[in-house]
Amino acid sequence: MIETADAEPEYDDTAIRFLEALWGEGYLSPGGPEEVDRVVEGLSLEGKTVLDIGCGAGGITLHLVDRHGAAHATGYDVEAPVIETARRRAEERGLADRTTFVQAPPGPLPFADASFDVVFSKDALLHVPDKDSLFAEIFRILAPGGIFAASNWMIGHDGDPSPDMKAYIAAEGLSFSMASPQRYRLAMERAGFQDITVTDRNHWYRDVAREELERLKGPLYRTVSAAVGSDYVDKNIHTWEAMQKVLDSGEHRPTHLRGWKPAEGR
């Protein structure tokens, strides 16, 4: 979702087809709209301008408009295949006038200061190595009083990954730059965020991932193989098995983050 500009896409059309078969149309991370709703639980997005960082195939961006009443949502990603899919889906659902999808290279976010009331992200920030610069940019583009709400995959510590975690990351073959919840909190504090909350979701995804693996090995195998090929499915079954080990050990820590940019005068 957030990668280097000159690399081949990590989320190409095959990856999109595979992940949508597992997680639902427009969703390239687990939990579907229900987990998105949990990330923004208790927040009002009605009439707000929202940025979705690492928007992928656009399902979440569209959900924030259609279900949560955002006045306008902008999806940002560095990869062309997912942005093309997101734009097509917005047209199909009649939401093109309330959404914008932006493809741009990694680095400073391509938006003016104080552009958004809300910045959202779902399991994409792990692709960004420099957490301090990332959150400084998020803070910059938020309006005073604005909210940051996200879910992200993290590691339970800031030392070297265990052999099992190294094996899992190698199996994924993606540009992971995982950091601990404590490291994310520190980056948010340095950027200026206040009232920061960090909510662990390991227990939830540990169980969900086990169900996903069972589905891939069972009822989904033939259907998904017809769409992407059995070799691709077999590779991902191996990846899920490696991921389950680090979820069970607690080293893999899916986590929710939330913080506020102070209103002017505070």
Feature names for model-found ranges:
Residues 118-130:
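A short SAM/SAH-binding and catalytic strip from SAM-dependent methyltransferases
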Residues 132-147:
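A short glycine-rich, Lys/Arg-flanked "PGG" loop and its adjoining helix->strand segment in the class I
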